[in-house]
Amino acid sequence: HEPGSTFKLMSMVAALEDKVIKPSDLIDTGNGEILFFGKHKVRDSRKGGYGKISVSKVFEVSSNTGMVKIINDNYKNNPENFVDRLYNMRLHKILDIPIIGEARPKIPYPSDPDWDGLDLPWMAFGYGVSITPLQTLTFYNAIANNGVMIKPKFIHKIGRLGAKPHKTYKSEILNPSICSKETLNAVQEMMFNVVEKKWGTANNIKDEMFSIAGKTGTCQIDYTTNSIEYISSFVGYFPADKPKYSCIVLIHKPNKLKGYYGSIVAAPVFKQIAKKIYSAIPKEIPVNLKDLKSNSTNSLL
């Protein structure tokens, strides 16, 4: 399916790697609307737009117009450069997981017969492309893993409980480095701010016990019909400072009367999953050795 705003991470990484922008650059989102060819409109969820904001904040507030300006303004004369960067990050290939039926990603290329003037700006915020949730998660996991893209693994080892395993499956590296350390640091901070900063689209799931980094997504489906539906999503990792787990949540066709934005529908589910996992992790408790008596028994958990 079309991923919507969760694909903005891929677009942002591409633009930063090509050095067409810097995180501190200002982007004019105007009144929150851009019109293409007199009838195709890109709009922000916030009416009136965000005015002039930094590249980082474009990501953190999930501005569609801001992301379109970043990508379209810098690549419209050479869209191949943008798509080639996506291809270099392996976004056009299947993961080749041991489950039958994995869909092949659709990343349009400028030489395709049906490429038109809307493809580039629409790709910037996750439309006109198609990628599975697991493929999306694998990319986000690479960001958490300092740029190393690892093939999803469903079985680590096989053996009897308590005995030495008779078979162990090694991790397979799909891409040893999807981007530079500079770009990694920049997007990791943006993803952290999505949750941490008051203007971030997922600030509602900020937790005092542990930090979360991620991105919200709200993708229209069936938008060529009279009945528009949505896929709400949140994808990220935690703890943000020392990532150990990554997760993606998608809610298909949520009740629009109760809400359909990824921040409202999917992000709280992510938080509940994260809290459940985090609460099960044994915590290290600092102990002063001077307080331990040599002739006494101490139990530490």
Regions inferred by a protein language model and the residue ranges of each:
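Short, gly/Ser/Thr-rich active-site loops of penicillin-recognizing serine hydrolases
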Residues: 165-173, 264-301
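Beta-lactam-recognizing serine transpeptidase/beta-lactamase-like catalytic domain environment
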Residues: 1-5, 10-253, 262, 297-301
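Short beta-strands and strand-coil junctions in structured, solvent-facing domains, enriched
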Residues: 256-257
